[in-house]
Amino acid sequence: MDHVSHAAQRKFNSLNLLLLPWPTEIKPTDFRVVLEPPHNIAELAKNAVYQEFAPKREDASTFAARVDRALALACEQSGEIHGVVFPECALNVEQYLAVEKVAWRHGVLLIAGVQESGPKWGRNVVIVQPLGLIEKSDKRPNKKGLDSRLETTRLGQYKHHRWCLDRPQILQYELGGRLPASRHCWEFIDIEQRELNFLSLGDWLSWCALVCEDLARQDPTAEIIRSVGPSLVVALPFRARVHRRRAS
């Protein structure tokens, strides 16, 4: 269980989150079949393939400027923002590192779904960065540089389960031109050791974050969450699942 500093705990009795549905558009061409998966895995069943989300990413500095403007506008309208949240796989590593510093400058918590590239597998991670919220309330000097402080407080939690796109989903999301509807299309990510990060804000709020598929699966992780009983669970959905025909 990680704790926000005592100074922050004394100050906050509410939590205002800015939810940014990024990217604003996802196209069928952002998905592709992985033609050459790693050789050290068991042979896929004949009715399954791996699929990868591979969108064209905006330049990190341009994207960070967007987030900076969004936070400034949200503060104008709401008075105070304590955190900003991005969906599953919304950012790549470069975008995340840029936005992390924007969140710190605004003194807010950052929760983001980040897509990492690996030598073989991709990785899907939710990263929580509380440093902005901590240092906004705790003004004590710190001799460490900003990058070092960000690295110290950064909490990463890798996705526990692969997403499987079946025929109904492929057709519903109009991905039939990119993924074979006749086969199960499994998310091309590595499954790391399962971890859960719980955070507390004073004695009134405890919370954790989960990537979308991990909330749906009733496995030992769900039992742990029920045992801890956090007052808030932040679930990061995959933006593509909110298709225009389903939006409400």
State each model region's role:
Residues A48-P55, I134-E195:
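Low-complexity, serine/threonine/proline-enriched polar segments
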Residues P21, P130, Q157-H161, V211-E213, ...:
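Short, structured patches in soluble enzyme cores that scaffold and shape functional sites
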Residues A8-L19, I26-P28, L150-T152, R194-A209:
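Beta-strand-turn-beta hairpins that frame and shape the catalytic cleft
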Residues E76-S78, H82-F86, Q172-S248:
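Active-site beta-loop-alpha substructure in enzyme catalytic cores
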Residues M1-G83, A90:
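N-terminal, active-site-proximal structural segment of metallo-dependent hydrolase catalytic domains
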